[in-house]
Amino acid sequence: MTYVRAFEHTSQVLEHNPMGDPHVRQVHVYLPPDYSERRKEPYPVVFMLAGWGGRGATYLADAGAFAQGLPQRLDRMIAARELPPCIVVFPDGSTRLGASQYVNSIANGNHMDYLCDELVDWVDERFHTHKSRDYRGIIGHSSGGFGALVCAMMRSDRFGALTSSAGDSWYEFLYTHTIPQTLEALRAAGGVKSFVDQFLASPNPMGLLGGRAIVAMLNLSMASCFTPNLEVPVIKGDLWFDLETGELIDEHWKRLLAWDPLRMVDRHVSDLRSLRFIQLESGSEDEYGLHLGHRQIAKKLQRHGIPLHIDEYPGKHSGHHHRMPLRIARMVKHLVES
């Protein structure tokens, strides 16, 4: 029987954040069938991170008449012994502008500390876990994949396994090829403030406003994550491109590039080598070039002698959440190996 519980968690590190986002957030937790505090062997834990514009509960949405949802798939795989019993945690890393990218920011608050310290400890206190990073993995798609990559690198004391599904990387392409669309959207709206106001006033901006508006808001939100500046109104961050010409602004561009997982690999070799499992998956036609980012990350890992599982499958950036249970299973099997 599927057992997903919803909790409200009060964060200390997110309280009074300059963006004004809530510090009381919902956390959903999947517990395996027959979960028991008296079980001899504690349960491994997987933290599952949503992409930009989503929350953890996004993964728990009803899959419709012709597909099983994620919790039901996990139940079925556990019953078939295809997946060791495990706990899966779905945190909320969203912000007013879309996403925190799960990093610490003077604008959005310390979301990495929230996830890696507050939530990890909260889960270990509340549930029957190993209370060890060696039995704790992190997985996510898109911005969630980025979050998994950077948390595993920067907080390898907390996570022993990593899965990135089309995680943000190779910023030279990812954060330049949408600059023209962003400028068009901002110009049509009458500037940054007007654009943000119109976007947030829409009852369903992701569905009604179109791709140009979405990539524009995504780029604006990245400034609050990676190039924060509290003196900048509305977005509280410095954009890395000129709003008139689109040319890169060197100072801000360098700050953004420092957060590219592709560049971070060389700074975190020992952290990555300590992980029990690394998995990179993506569609072979990802329109954001993230399959190429993964290939470049894999090449660096291989150069450092760090083992990994990398896979590409037919498809673009979206529409592949049905692969998540298999990724979780592959990760958890490595976590429970002695």
Regions found by a protein language model. Give the residues of each.
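Non-catalytic cap/lid and distal C-terminal segments of serine-dependent acyl enzymes
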Residues: 1-338
